[in-house]
Amino acid sequence: QVWYGAHAGDHFIYPDCRPEFLSAMNAVAQICHTFPISVEAPFLNYSKAEIVKIGLDLGIDYSKTWTCYEGQDQACGKCGSCNERLEAFALNNTADPLTYQG
């Protein structure tokens, strides 16, 4: 199995995060390998806030997760990914434990 983190908020931004992409990849994966694999996107129909809620309920240590696209030692807090992450935590009335620049 191959798992990836596409979520509902990404459908319109990234073609590889759309349900049609997942279906097509699974069709290709079934015929292209000696041992067929499946491509899984368990959060495809969940918002980022819903994903954060699931993680909080499971006790995930979000200080050990990364969202920023800038590739620095600390998250920038300004890119689209950081903004979505901060909003997801805010919608869950929880402070994001990640340290941000500035």
Question: What feature does the model see in each segment?
Answer:
Residues 1-102:
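Nucleotide-activated chemistry modules centered on ATP-dependent adenylation/adenylyltransferase
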